[in-house]
């Protein structure tokens, strides 16, 4: 337990103090790891508060930290009332179904999903599912593709221009095309997932493909010559070469790419949701902007902070996985 | 978690027993009940207070009582909304009265859209920016220090002429080419001698700015105040709460409500595609039933339910503007200049004066305005106007829904027109700002009364 705790950077000095080791040194570490970030945050909050009270928009004053807290509470309350309404909805539905079966025994009762509005928490969930689906799809394409072109200098030169051209394309440019193509190709009477989800997912995929492809290719291409020689001496087959030599040695670079990709995926998703009116945090922001109520700016600010926090958490999770699977622990510290 | 599940299960069980009991009790009464062919429906709307019948039918459970499970979804703009009804992503929607007509005759997107339910009367206003207002004000007669309403466009004319002389375009916003707002703004401008411009679809010109003194262009309703604040347009015609929003934000002044341009004018309708209506006739009837009840609730006891309705509308998933902004117009008042709040009890009418009944004469008025401004580029016979109105407006469906409500005892026969004798034509209507009388049975004769506008065989 203590070893697990002491692995987390900001907890380890506390653990050491508890053990009675090097008290003054550890206090310094604590100030550095906790005190400084806290001070930074405080200064930021103060500047924010001061700036907010000086900006007057036609929707009222710019929201300060206090308004954001109020709005967060409001959004949470809304979430719970909506859940209660959903429960009542299902109850009424059961009753109605039962009454109908009574009259019409051939009727097969069906429970329909709640028809009310998605709450803020639901929107966060939708956004997370969408971004992860898009990201996983992109990784499934990008890693194998990166390995293949990384292994062959010729293939790399052949595909490089395509990659370089598509890499800087903004999601906003892809979106109309993706929307039209998805509408044309994804036709079914009872679709498993909504069209809007597929559109967002593919847009995210197209935009976050490239960092992984490039980093994987570079990682694969820069495997130490010695390792390649070993593989040749052992006469490993292509697949075995990839599995035993290429993958393990290029993993730090692959993960650097994946982290960049996930960051881009998250940013792209919010833009795509805003523009295409696809459910999620982006749509939440847009809807609030359209509403133009005196709470709107505060709510948008809540979303901004949520988006930031989630982006940060996603990055940390990737970093953790990277540390777990990577042999070169020094390559992934930031 | 398990606790909640067991709780829910016991609840459902007792509910089942209860329901079974109720069903046996009421069985003979409803034995002939029909079931909707399609129970899960998705309706679109635009964030405007006159979507209220939809929100109320949902929140008050009227849809559910008809066995319909409805999802309401805000749409980005009128074009997206119409396209989604046409391609079936939406089962129906809150539409501009001109939209089903425009779509059916093929101005804009061609598709056969019908309506069996008129959602409300009045509810729009024309707002100008503070700057234009201060220029207009000197031309408006005052009484007790307050401007005399209704304000005619005559007061705006010198301002527009000044812009024209300076070579600057005078831009105004409306929400859609076939919107009520477009026709009302045009009517008001033309009544004051300002030419709002012609359309010429046969030449591919759908901008509506030929010969125009004031250039009108499309902006989605919720973006109107922001667009005017940015200086792109000097004024606009839009539904609530976007006129009152301008007052609250202090960026503009509403000059006239549409009630003053044409007393009790038909505004929004509930539109569905003809194909959808043919496929799901029972569902359609049930939807209309639920919405008639919602409209009746909105106007019941002299607007007694309006504050509750405003509370519903101010939720973020519906209109989402502040309670006070929506309440201003929904509870029968209208604020012109800041502080100049006046009674307009009929600003939003949802049910009284047979507001929900789809009158042919209403449809024909819109068609006459389409002809007047060139959206219909050729002369049409009076019969054509009649046939088109009958193709789109469906009082027969409305009547069957209303009759069921009367039979079920939910509403009274005196709440409705007498279906046995109703022709669908309102008697000749006065109450227009320019005092021209409208008789729906003589559209061509009506067109001849306008000084500005196409008539007879005229063509752009």
Predicted feature residues:
Chain B
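Solvent-exposed alpha-helix faces
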Residues: 16, 90, 233, 292-296
């Amino acid at each position: 337990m203590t070893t697990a705790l002491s692995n987390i950077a900001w907890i380890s000095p506390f653990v050491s103090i508890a053990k009675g080791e090097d008290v003054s040194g550890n206090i310094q570490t604590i100030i550095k790891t906790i005190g400084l970030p806290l001070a930074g945050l405080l200064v930021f909050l103060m500047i924010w508060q001061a700036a907010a009270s000086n900006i007057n928009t036609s929707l009222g004053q710019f929201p300060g930290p206090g308004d954001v807290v109020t709005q967060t509470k409001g959004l949470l309350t809304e979430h719970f009332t909506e859940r209660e309404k959903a429960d009542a909805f299902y109850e009424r539905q059961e009753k109605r179904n039962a009454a109908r079966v009574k009259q019409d025994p051939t009727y097969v009762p069906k429970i329909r999903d709640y028809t009310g509005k998605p709450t803020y928490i639901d929107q966060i969930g939708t956004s997370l599912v969408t971004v992860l689906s898009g990201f996983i799809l992109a990784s499934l394409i990008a890693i194998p593709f990166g390995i293949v072109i990384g292994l062959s200098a010729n293939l790399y030169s052949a595909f490089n221009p395509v990659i370089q051209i598509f890499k800087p394309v903004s999601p906003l440019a892809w979106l109309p095309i993706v929307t039209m193509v998805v509408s044309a190709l994804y036709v079914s009477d009872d679709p498993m997932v909504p069209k809007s989800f597929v559109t967002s997912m593919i847009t995210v995929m197209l935009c976050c493909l490239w960092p992984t492809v490039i980093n994987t290719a570079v990682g694969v291409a820069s495997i130490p010559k010695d390792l390649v020689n070993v593989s040749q001496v052992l006469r490993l087959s292509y697949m075995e070469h990839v599995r035993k030599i290429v993958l393990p040695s290029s993993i730090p670079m692959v993960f650097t790419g994946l982290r960049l990709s996930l960051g881009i995926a998250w940013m792209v998703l919010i833009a795509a949701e805003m523009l295409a009116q696809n459910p999620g945090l982006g749509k939440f922001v847009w809807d609030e902007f359209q509403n133009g109520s005196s709470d709107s700016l505060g709510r948008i600010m809540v979303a901004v902070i949520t988006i930031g926090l989630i982006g940060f958490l996603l990055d940390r999770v990737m970093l953790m996985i990277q540390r777990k699977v990577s042999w070169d622990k020094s390559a992934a510290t930031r | 978690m398990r606790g909640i599940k067991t709780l829910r299960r016991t609840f459902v069980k007792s509910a089942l027993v209860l329901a079974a009991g109720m069903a046996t009790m009421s069985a003979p009464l409803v034995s002939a009940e029909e079931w909707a062919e399609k129970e899960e429906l998705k309706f679109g709307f635009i964030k405007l207070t006159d979507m209220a019948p939809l929100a109320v039918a949902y929140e008050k459970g009227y849809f559910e009582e008809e066995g319909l499970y409805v999802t309401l979804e805000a749409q980005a703009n009128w074009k997206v909304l119409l396209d989604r009804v046409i391609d079936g992503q939406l089962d129906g929607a809150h539409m501009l009265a001109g939209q089903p007509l425009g779509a059916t005759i093929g101005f804009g997107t061609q598709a056969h859209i019908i309506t069996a339910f008129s959602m409300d009367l009045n509810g729009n206003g024309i707002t100008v920016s503070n700057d234009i207002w201060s220029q207009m004000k000197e031309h408006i007669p005052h009484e007790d220090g307050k401007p005399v309403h209704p304000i005619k466009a005559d007061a705006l004319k010198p301002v527009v002429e000044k812009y024209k002389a300076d070579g600057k375009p005078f831009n105004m916003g409306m929400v859609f080419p076939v919107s009520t707002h477009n026709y009302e703004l045009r009517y008001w401008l033309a009544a004051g001698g300002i030419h709002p411009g012609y359309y010429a679809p046969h030449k591919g010109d759908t901008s509506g700015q030929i010969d125009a003194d004031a250039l009108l262009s499309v902006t989605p309703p919720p973006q109107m105040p922001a667009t005017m604040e940015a200086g792109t347009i000097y004024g606009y015609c839009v539904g609530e709460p976007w006129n009152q929003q301008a007052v609250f934000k202090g960026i503009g002044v509403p000059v006239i409500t549409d009630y003053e341009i044409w007393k009790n004018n038909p505004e929004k309708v509930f539109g569905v595609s003809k194909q959808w209506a043919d496929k799901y006739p029972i569902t359609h009837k049930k939807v209309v039933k639920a919405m008639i009840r919602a409209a009746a609730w909105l106007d019941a006891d002299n607007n007694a339910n309006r504050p509750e309705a405003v509370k519903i509308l101010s939720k973020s998933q519906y209109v989402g503007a502040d309670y006070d902004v929506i309440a201003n117009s929904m509870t029968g008042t209208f604020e012109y200049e800041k502080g100049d709040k006046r009674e307009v009890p009929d600003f939003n009418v949802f049910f009284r004066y047979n507001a929900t009944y789809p009158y042919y004469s209403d449809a024909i008025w819109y068609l006459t305005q389409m002809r007047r401004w060139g959206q219909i580029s050729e002369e049409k016979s009076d019969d054509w106007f009649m046939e088109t109105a009958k193709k789109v407006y469906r009082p027969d469906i409305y009547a069957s829904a209303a009759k069921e409500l009367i039979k079920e005892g939910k509403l009274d026969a005196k709440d409705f027109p007498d279906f046995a004798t109703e022709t669908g034509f309102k008697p000749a209507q006065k109450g227009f700002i320019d005092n021209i009388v409208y008789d729906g049975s003589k559209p061509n004769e009506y067109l001849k009364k306008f000084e500005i506008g196409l008539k007879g065989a005229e063509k752009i």
